[in-house]
Amino acid sequence: MKPSFFSSIVIVILCTLILSSCEQALFAPTPGADNASVFDSMWENVRNKYTFFTFKRIDWNALRTKYRNRAIDARNDEELFTVLAAMLNELQDDHTNLKSHFDISRAQPFFNDSANFDIGIVRRFYARKQELITGSLVNFIIERNGKKYGFIRYDSFLSPIDTIAWNTVLRRFRRENVEGMIFDIRNNGGGALANAVFLASRLAKRRSEALLEMTKNGPGENDYNTPKKLIITPDTSAAEQQYRFIDKRVAVLTNRNSYSAASFFPAILKSPEFDHVRLIGDHTGGGSGLPMDAQLPNAWTYRFSGTKSFIPAGLISREQALAAAPRANHDADWSIGYNFEWGVPVDIKIDMNLADRSRDAIIERAVEYLATGR
């Protein structure tokens, strides 16, 4: 993903096949790629372009001391890969990976957090086999006390949301005269920001200057470009009004496994143009930096965050910031806004009791909000 809100990830992998055997080609050494030059190439590039050292209180120079000799002493590709992956994982950033022909490293910084999601419970006790699969949107109706609530499950922002599918679901909800809508993006690992922008444009009451993005443009700690704005512009034409859900309450369900684009979408919803929307569940997993790609002298590729994004100043309190990201240095960019790299704070925090196999406490709390506004 290039460092821009509306651009796509472009990964270029250069492979040079040598000899006639596929196995020989895959495992052939790269001439001149000694361990020291491979390590130094990665360390220096990340030093110059990574965006969250200050926010995460990371001493990159100290990590060079910690890992460089280990890399030099690595006896084979697997050992070198392990050292480089361990250093990248110190960034605590799930947009950071090292890729070789035999493995891909993963950080998973919130892997041990409560899942707060069980798709089996949703299917058995809420969908009850009456869900429709409309494009990438699984949708059904929840009934409580004579009232109906529309429910949408969106598994991945990698799955395109087209206008026809969205409009079809909205027409169904209008026919059923739902009191509000639940939009579930728990355990959504992200994908295309264009899908987040599409959804936000259908929920925005008016034009919104939703987020700010900064891109690293030099090796210095403060070498960034002027913040760019992400603008959400809804279609306000009369023909599109029935497909904008702005007249009733919306609950967006999140957990720590809502990452990347599944954090950008909730971050957008913090703007005042979405005052009918509440985030319910657990804080998101974050991922506010868009990844940039690079290649090492031995032909391995890697990626790391080359931008940082913010909810504009004044929309997130210090208390909320610390609740979502207690280990972060929020003073680093507080005058610009809240950096949601380690999570977007929810409006209503609630955890599931996974011992209760017939109830989703987060869905139940969402229904309460839709019914009462509280």
Task: Name each region found by the language model.
Residues 4, 125-126, 279-281:
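Intrinsically disordered, low-complexity segments enriched in polar/charged residues with Gly/Pro
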